[in-house]
Structures are given as structure tokens and as C-alpha cells.
Amino acid sequence: MKISILLMFLWGLSCALPVTRYQNNESEDSEEWKGHLAQAPTPPLESSESSEGSKVSSEEQANEDPSDSTQSEEGLGSDDHQYIYRLAGGFSRSTGKGGDDKDDDEDDSGDDTFGDDDSGPGPKDRQEGGNSRLGSDEDSDDTIQASEESAPQGQDSAQDTTSESRELDNEDRVDSKPEGGDSTQESESEEHWVGGGSDGESSHGDGSELDDEGMQSDDPESIRSERGNSRMNSAGMKSKESGENSEQANTQDSGGSQLLEHPSRKIFRKSRISEEDDRSELDDNNTMEEVKSDSTENSNSRDTGLSQPRRDSKGDSQEDSKENLSQEESQNVDGPSSESSQEANLSSQENSSESQEEVVSESRGDNPDPTTSYVEDQEDSDSSEEDSSHTLSHSKSESREEQADSESSESLNFSEESPESPEDENSSSQEGLQSHSSSAESQSEESHSEEDDSDSQDSSRSKEDSNSTESKSSSEEDGQLKNIEIESRKLTVDAYHNKPIGDQDDNDCQDGY
């Protein structure tokens, strides 16, 4: 979480810095643009030829020396937000050159209608010439090269015919400025598309490894997943920055950034699930080891203790439950004394051994209720470490049993009013009477020779209580639903029969008025 928060913070800073620089550069470029447009507008043919010449020169530079393109890509961290404005500056200078040519034409012919007619489509053609390179970058590179190689020949011939050094200087500026801008833009767009795909594939590979290994993933796998997440975050940040900086024409890069965002979310979820699985496995291993150690200690204590003959399983479970109640009452009344502490230790050891044997029996398939046994495992593992915390946990469990008994008594009172389940009444009433009668037999046992029977009876009793309460609650809900349906039917019938005489149809207006 900390790493993700830091990455989001850095992403916000990286988005804020280009925006401020964009505003400053835009103000400067807008002033230059207005200054050149105030002189004279440009003819469309010459601006399109200059844009095509800049495209061809950028393509030749990218094909001849790829080292320059890689260096320009490495410098994109600080310069990727400036290439668009270099293009804008280059077009503004080309407008100045075009204005000079048009002034010469007007001086020769003495006609002012030439500039007025061509002032409209000039900026549009310039924008189309600059944006056509970005739009058709990956679809038709060869056709653009073949069609553009003819344009610089005519441009060179036109430059040979001109004799003014001022126009040649302006032409060199136009060629040099968009050349750097287009080369950086081309390398940036292609590298982002290809690099984003490679990062996405590597990150998908990490996620598939996590899915295949599942529970068996160790710490190196989690480290690898974190590295994949960091890679995905960096790739997503790069693609988002490129999409925001070139939002005039780079629609494909923005699509790539959207494609990269979704796998990053999926891999975050997969890494979280794998980490939770690892934690749950470690907890299970710890609880199993504690259960084994406690079972060996309790077996020794049972060998040294007194062996008592077999009793009825119901009597054993009732005496166990009421033993803890009486111990809690004695501790609350008499305070922490030596005898109560010894009795609490003995009872905690007995209860821990019982819950451990419940875990073993459930692992064999005797008791198919894993949630309660898992809670008891956690409580008993804590009790084996600290006896005081164990007595507190058992006091909580006994308070829960008291609440369950009170709820069962309330459900008995309600079931007497609605005699729908007599069997549930009899079983719950017998259990309540037995629980009250067994309060006199507290502190009668210290070691049980057969604890499996008593534990199974406890689990069966708890299941019967839950089943009885569920059946009673379901019967109550059914009765309430039936009453609601009957009332709604009565209301509809009354509304149908009590309509006014004049209202013959179903609409709200009465026909008698």
C-alpha cells in the first residue's frame, strides 16, 4: 500500500509539471503566432510542402541512425512535453516565410486579392499536414514515404530558383525544428506502444505463475509479483503521460495506456489474494503445531490423572459447561485465589484437550463443521500459551452459551403461542431443564476417559439448537408473509368493490361528473 501511494503521488507531480510548462510555452507560442499572422497569412501549398519535408527528414533520420532516436527517447523524461511546441514554432516561422513570398507576389502583380482569398484554409492545411503523420503512423508508413519523396524534389527546385538568403535561412529553420520534434515524437510513440506490450506480457506471466502455483507460493513469488506491479505502474505512468501530452493526435497511445491500466488492477488483486493465502497457510501450520504439542502434554496429564468410569455423554457435556460457569462465578465472588486459579488451569487444560480432539475428529470426517472448530482451535492455542487469557476466552464462550440458552427460552415462549413445531419445543425444553438441573453438579470432574463422545454430543446439541432456532424463525417468517399477502388481497378486493357507481373504467377520472 505504501508503494502504491508513493507511485500515485509521483504520478500526480509528473502530471502537474507538464501542465505548468504547457501554459507558459503556450502563452509564448501564442504571442509569436499572433505576431506572424499579423504580418500576412500563408498559402496552403507551401506550408504543406514544408510539413512534408519535415516528415521525410525525420523518417530518414530515424532510419539511418537509431542511436539518436534511442537517445531522444531517454531524454523524453524532461523533453517529451516540448516537441509539440517545437512544431508550433516551426509552423510560425514558415508562416513568416510565406508572408515574405506573398509580399513579393503582391509587389509584382499589384493585386491584394491573392492574400485575402488564401487566408482561410492556411492554418487548417497546416494542422492536417502535422496531424497526418501522427494518425497514420502504424498503418501506412511505406506509402507515405513513397508519396513524400517526390515532394522534397519539387521543394529543392523551388529553393534553387529563389535567390534571397533570408528565405533560405527560414527554410533551414523550418527543416531543423520539426525534424527534432517529429523524430522524438515518432520514437516516443513507437517505443511506448512496443514497450507497453512487453511490460504487459511480462506482468501477465507473473500473474499466471501466481495462479498456477496457488497455495504453494513462497516469499520469492510475492517479491516477483511486487516487481511486476512496479513495472506495470511505471509503464502505466509513462503511457498516461504520453497520452496527456499528445492528446491532440495520439489516440493509439491513449488506448494503449487504457489497456495497461486494467492488467495492473488485476495483478494487484492477484498479489493480494496470494499474500492472504500465504498468511492463512502460515496460521494453519502454527495452529496444527500448537495442537500437536498441547495434545502430547494433555495426554501426559491424563495418564497421571484419575480415570473415571464412563457416564452418559449428555451428562458429561452438561457438567463441562456448568463447571466453567461455576468457576467464573467463584472467581467473580471470591476474587483471584490460589484454589480458583488451580481449578481454572485444570479446566482450561481439559477444555483445550477436548477442542484438540474435536479438531482431530473433524479432520477424520466425524464432524463436518469446520468454522466452529477453527474458532475453538484459535482460542485453545491462545489458552495453551497464557492461562489467564484462556479463562477470559472461555468466559466469553460461556457468556455466548448463556445468551443462546436465553434465546432458546424466548423461542420456547414464542413457540408455545404458535404450536407449529412440537418436536422442537420438546427437545429445546428438555435441554433447558437439563441445563438448569446440571448446575448442582459443578466441579465434579477433572479428567475424562472418553472425551470424543462428549465432544460429539456437544456438537450435536449445538447443531440441534441451531436447527430448532432456524426452523422456528422460518416458520415465523412464513406466517408473517402469509398475513401480509392476505391483507394485501383484502385491500385490493375492498378497493375493487368500493368503487363509485359512475366510475365504470379503470382510469382515475369518474364518469359521473
UniProtKB/Swiss-Prot annotation:
Sequence segments annotated as region (Disordered): 23-513
Keyword Ribosomal protein: no
Main location as per UniProt: nucleus
Expression (tissue specificity): Expressed in tooth particularly in odontoblast, ameloblast and cementoblast.
Localization in the cell: Nucleus; Cytoplasm; Secreted, Extracellular space, Extracellular matrix
Positions bearing carbohydrate: N25, N285, N324, N345, N351, N413, N426, N467
Chain intervals with Low complexity compositional bias: 46-60, 337-354, 427-442
Domain of life the protein comes from: Eukaryota
Pfam entry (one): DMP1
Alphabetically ordered keywords of this record: Biomineralization, Cytoplasm, Extracellular matrix, Glycoprotein, Nucleus, Phosphoprotein, Secreted, Signal
A single cellular component GO annotation: extracellular matrix
Intervals of motif Cell attachment site: 364-366
InterPro entries, per the entry: DMP1
Biased composition (Acidic residues): 101-119, 208-220, 275-287, 376-386, 417-426, 503-513
Involvement in disease: Hypophosphatemic rickets, autosomal recessive, 1: A hereditary form of hypophosphatemic rickets, a disorder of proximal renal tubule function that causes phosphate loss, hypophosphatemia and skeletal deformities, including rickets and osteomalacia unresponsive to vitamin D. Symptoms are bone pain, fractures and growth abnormalities.
PANTHER family associated with the record: DENTIN MATRIX ACIDIC PHOSPHOPROTEIN 1 (PTHR23400:SF0)
Protein name (record): Dentin matrix acidic phosphoprotein 1
Taxonomic lineage from the root: Eukaryota, Metazoa, Chordata, Craniata, Vertebrata
